[in-house]
């Protein structure tokens, strides 16, 4: 352990990083294989170019809370495991695997081959109903902030579902939508 001034941490980590006066240098967490994830029961969350580390962290926290076994993000166009992501995840980064995939559509195809029902979440989809998936292993696929699911990702999913919204908003932040969808899927 080394003690240093707060200003030095600001300089080392960047002024926009909330470090609360502490920093740790650690090895990366091990990444399990997709096969080992498939051996565990529970939903899987797939992120299609979700780029804000705070959204990814919040999604991981919700995924851990509602029994997901892993979150899969693309190896590019997705944030690294930074302090901001870890802070938003509130411990989920240490308990829930974050896998990296080269190609999201191919990952969905591999999951479908393993009898995982892949549901893309989109504002224009039919209403999501957790009880309708009671007898299926499910992967919830979430699109990027603003753009949503990419065309190939959407076409590769088994179905596209949405959240029933009665208010004045047309859509939700991806992390809020993920939490609601994961809750709905957990009501089995």
Explain the meaning of each model-derived region.
Residues 1-188:
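Post-transcriptional modification and biogenesis factors for structured RNAs
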């Amino acid at each position: 352990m080394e003690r240093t001034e707060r200003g030095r941490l600001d300089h080392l980590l960047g002024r926009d990083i909330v470090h609360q006066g502490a920093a740790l240098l650690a090895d990366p967490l091990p990444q399990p294989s997709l096969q080992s994830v498939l051996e565990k029961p529970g939903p899987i969350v797939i992120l299609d170019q979700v780029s804000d580390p705070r959204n990814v962290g919040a999604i991981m926290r919700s995924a851990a809370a509602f029994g997901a076994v892993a979150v899969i993000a693309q190896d590019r166009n997705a944030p690294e495991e930074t302090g901001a992501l870890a802070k938003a995840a509130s411990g989920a980064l240490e308990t829930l695997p974050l896998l990296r995939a080269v190609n999201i559509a191919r990952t969905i195809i591999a999951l479908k081959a393993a009898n995982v029902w892949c549901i893309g979440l989109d504002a224009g989809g039919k209403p999501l109903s957790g009880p309708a998936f009671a007898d299926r292993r499910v992967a919830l696929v979430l699109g990027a902030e603003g753009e949503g699911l990419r065309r190939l990702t959407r076409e590769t999913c088994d179905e596209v579902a949405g959240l029933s919204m009665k208010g004045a908003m047309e859509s939700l932040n991806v992390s809020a939508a993920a939490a609601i969808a994961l809750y709905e899927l957990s009501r089995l």
